[in-house]
């Protein structure tokens, strides 16, 4: 059956799931996060520490809403763990952290400063996780789905390894949003291939997030359709927006341009 037209019609299916986090999702938080984005390339440690702290808070709030207690002692699998900043932040929160990262360069990018904080790390693809079914309490993927050719295979793998009653949190950058082109800037609105060519012409090398090989056009509708097809989706909201702007997730076409980053929350049964 072709599900491309079957889009999840609402932003929140089970409102209580986001009750705690909604209190944190203020305009002040949104502006603070936005101000950090300019440091991603020149000062990545600053940017990723801020993003990691916010992610830990978001996951903790979602777990608290669904389970009535913080996720202390719970096992979290981070699909696309990168250079270890999330590991340090989750360790500080008392979460048992396992990171999965296919690129060894990313695994070592943060240097030795984070090693004492690190949990366990596995080099593997998120589209074929080397874990048994029902192995972890929480499965997180932050800004990874747009970098793999089969994002919903990644999503299905996340569901597979998460225990019934656990939590899957999948967040990704929407292609047509202002940050969809990553370091290519707004030129992605000219088309991905053209933007990639312009980047090479300007910088003399291909972008790290290279269209067609490490960056793919993933829409909000794609994610909402996939979430609906699983039967276990409980929430969807814009990651960086204040609570009063979450309604944008419900508006076709508009959401592709203004939601920017979509969070899908699922509870396996």
Curated annotation (Swiss-Prot):
Protein name (record): Uncharacterized methyltransferase ML2584
Pfam families referenced in this protein's UniProt entry, alphabetically: Methyltransf_11
Organism: Mycobacterium leprae (strain TN)
EC code: 2.1.1.-
InterPro entries, per database record: Methyltransf_11, SAM-dependent_MTases_sf
Keyword check for Ion transport: no
Organism placement in taxonomy: Bacteria, Bacillati, Actinomycetota, Actinomycetes, Mycobacteriales
Keyword Repeat found: no
Gene Ontology MF: a single term: S-adenosylmethionine-dependent methyltransferase activity
Keywords, comma-separated and alphabetical: Methyltransferase, Transferase
Family: Belongs to the methyltransferase superfamily.
Gene Ontology biological-process annotations: methylation
